[in-house]
Amino acid sequence: MLSSNQRKLISQLDKKKHRLEKNLFVAEGKKVVSELINSDWPFKNLFSTEENFHPDVELLTLADMKKITNFKTPSQALGVFFLPKSKKILSEPITIAIDGISDPGNLGTVIRLCDWFGISELICSKNTVDCFNSKVIQASMGSIARVSCHYVSDLGATLTEMQKPIYGATLDGDSIYSNKLPNKASYVFGSESHGISKTLLTKLEGKLSIPQFREGDNKVDSLNVANATAIFLSELFRGLKIKNG
C-alpha cells in the first residue's frame, strides 16, 4: 500500500531542487525501470501493479499508480532511484555536446541516440534541461543507464580543453554530405529556437548543416535537435564504417 510519505516524496522529486536535495529521481515505465534495475542502478523503492515484477517490489493498485504518475496513463512500474555519483569526463574520440536544450523529450531522445551509436557520455551546458527529469528518463527508454550526462558551467571551455576540433550544427554550415566528418571531434547541437550560443560559436572549427532538399519558398524552417542529431550521427558512423571497411 502506498503511504502518504511515499506519495509526497515522489511528488517532490518532480522538481530538480528536491532531486538534488534528496539525491533521488523517479523513473516510470516497465521497460525503463527494468533497464535501470538490470544495470544494477541502486534504488530506494520499486512500485508495480505486477506482483512478479521484482522480488523487492511494492505492489500497488492501478488507482494508487494514478496518484503518483507524471503521465496521463499510469505505467505498470515506477521506481525511485538514487542519483549517480559524479564521473570524470572520459573525452572519447567522438564527443556529443548539447547547448541549451529545454525540451525533455528531445534530450531523452538524444540520450537514446548516443546509446544506439555507442557513445557513452553527453556533455551539456548548465542551461540544458536536467537529464533526471522524469520525462527525459521516459524518452531515453532506459538509455540513461548507459549514457553519462555531464553538466558544465562553461561548455566552450570544457570542449576546448579536450584538444579536439569543435564543430557545430547550424543552418548556415557546410553540408554534412559534401564533407568528410572527422572521427575525432566534438559535435555541438543547440536548441531549435535559439541554436548554438554566440560565445560557443566563436570556439567552432567549422559549421555543419543538413541540406534541405525541398525547393521553393515554402520550406521547413528547421529540424528539432533530436532529428538533427539522428541524421548527423548516422552520417558520421556511416563514414566511419566505410573507412574501416
Language model segments and positions:
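Glycine/small-residue-rich loop that forms an oxyanion/phosphate-binding "nest" at active or ligand-binding sites
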Residues: E58-F82
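Amphipathic alpha-helical repeat scaffolds
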Residues: G29, S102-V110, V220-A228
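Structured adenosyl-cofactor binding patch, chiefly the S-adenosyl-L-methionine
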Residues: G79, D115-F117, C131-A145, T202-G245
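Boundary-proximal intrinsically disordered activation/regulatory segments immediately upstream
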Residues: M1-T49, T128-D130
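Active-site/ligand-binding-proximal alpha/beta "capping" segment
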Residues: G168-K219
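Short acidic-hydrophobic, aromatic-tinged amphipathic segments that line or gate anion-handling sites
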Residues: M1, A27, E58-T61, R146-L155, ...
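RNA substrate-binding interface of SAM-dependent RNA methyltransferases
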Residues: N38, K88-D172
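Active-site regions of enzymes building and remodeling cell-envelope glycoconjugates
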Residues: H54-K66, P93, P165, K180-S186, ...
